[in-house]
Amino acid sequence: MKSKKIFEWVRILLFSAVLIGGCVLGFILSLRPATSESEGRTLTKFPQFNTESFLSGEYTSQISLWYADTFPFRDLLLDLSGDLKGLYGVGDQEFEGYHGEADTLDMNQDFVWDKEPSAPPPTMENPVPPSEEETTSAETETDTSAEEPPVAETIDGYYVKGDTCWELYYYKADLVDRYCRVVVQAALDLDGIATVYDMVVPTSYCYALSNEELQKLGASDGLQTIEFIYTAVDAYCPQAGVTNPVVTMPVHELLAQHKDEYIYYRTDHHWTAKGAWYTSRYFLDAVNRPYPALEEYEVFTYDTFLGSLYRHTQSEGLKKHPDYVDAYLSPNVKEVTIFRDDIYQSRPLIDLEVTSSNKYTCFSSGDHQYYETYNPTIGDGSSLLIIKESYGNAFIPMVADSYEHVYAIDYRFWGGDLVSFVQEKGIDTVLFLNNLMATADDYTVRCLERLVN
């Protein structure tokens, strides 16, 4: 009886010690993380006090959210939680995420340029790129008043099977039409100044999922959608009065020939440097620009990479089979100039010392509103402008050796005047480079519309 009572007291004391220790640990501010490596996001900040939020109860609610979101050793605890779930035997099972609702794609529809204008684009006088730790994909956030732009480039659709995750595309007729009109309007604005090229890059699901799976998930045929976009652009150009029409780049046909190669990550929504390399050569051949052979590039590898799709799903199947990142180091161009924090900064074109979990930021220093490379071995005054989202980050190093000047703007954050910029820099080639997801996302389409309105 006595030993039983001692055991009960020991158990109570141990429980109390753990409880008190956890409380004390939770209040040590120096241990509270500001970012989450495993989720790839900035954690909730401690709220600023004001009387209105205090009286409404919002202030105390935000403190509770901050306390829970920034608990010390948060990532370690998440990893342990994932490991425990893996012991349940569910880690490698098929997992279906959000099922979107796609519009019907009519390949035989009539395209009429003159119609009522769409909704006005967002007004963002000083759009801000994501933090150094973040880079994203085409991106569902629509609140343009937020302190930072959206960090996720998804339309909230994903499909996990085994060690691979795919973003799913849901065709939206109005958004795709607005995307096409932006490209054609840019060609009209730049008519006689520069030739406009349009490259819509398929995402990995386009080559990996069967028609049966697409029907089951309600997802759209991405390759057919790209062909539809190019058909619309070709039809709109003469109606709009463009004398130098948009040149469409059917790289989806090229990438289909290499679909069994490592051209997409399994745990991230981006393409790999190899995928960007194939499409860059297709583009450079079309514009008759020289480029180095693949053997002339030094290859640098990050061995372990768990990307945005892992952070989105926290799938054990992905965690057990991480990606790797190959980066091709240009033989001639080592640096890129970016615009960040209101100043121009020189960064490595390929960063060999990325410390964050998001290794994709090694390409062109991640997401910024403006980029510029200079190749001293070419003195012909040639210049290229890339209008891009984050897929363009891996593309910039692939064309840096082919032009004296390569400029790139991320339309999600850049607020300049397109025509004035092209004229000022003497640019004669403009490339719209977007992954398929960007064409059916309201935020990215509205940001694109700012370029031509």
Name what the model sees in each region.
Residues M1-N453:
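Extracellular glycan-modifying ectodomains
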